[in-house]
Amino acid sequence: MRLYLSSFRMGDHPEHLVALAGGDGRRSVVIANAMDDAPPGVRRASVELELAALADLGLGAAELDLRDYFGHRQRLRQDLAGVGMAWLRGGNAFMLRYALDRSGADTLFGELLAADALVYAGYSAGACVLSPSLRGLELVDDADAVTRTYGSPPLWDGLALLGEAFVPHYRSPGHPETAAIERVVTRYRAEGIAYRTLHDGQALLVNGPETKIV
């Protein structure tokens, strides 16, 4: 399994992402469904920001919108077959989790990562959804946005590809969510939930048996 999970944006050492994902000639995609509750113009700008940042690293990418695959899991499987790296940007973890479920991407990513068929990369919400559970993140993200947008309740289970909760923006001065993240950590400690904190600039790198913070 290959993962590059940053606290915020590309992190301070994106060369690790390039080493992990670059060079195999396959395309990269940006998944921005954590921004699906944002106004269309804001969402579009957020996609362009990620595409430009990846292009600066030599990783040309295009958006893959999971909403286009709601109820079409097999078509998504076919389209992901040619993808070498998926970059899942931050935003609302509950919105992203819902889109992963409706499209079938949650199980597909599990299968593809187990087969070492792609790199899963991203930051903030894009990393948090890999946790065993999203409980506690309602202190940071608006879980009710799922109901307002889709008329369905939010999902609370994560993809459980990580053995502990991923906690970004921890004690990261200047980030607007760092105070709320402190409350998340306090809850996890009180409830005995295993977690891993990352400061902005850091990333969790998983490359087969190797796991480290970069």
Question: What are these language model-derived features?
Answer:
Residues 1-94, 189-214:
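Extended, subdomain-level signal for the structured scaffold at the beginning of enzyme domains
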Residues 14-16, 40-41, 97-99, 130-133, ...:
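Short glycine-/acidic-enriched loop or helix-start segments at secondary-structure transitions
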Residues 64-68, 93-99, 125-136, 153, ...:
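Short flexible/disordered coil segments
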Residues 98-172:
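Class I SAM-dependent methyltransferase SAM-binding "motif I" and its flanking Rossmann-like core
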Residues 157-201:
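Conserved anion/nucleotide-ligand pocket segment
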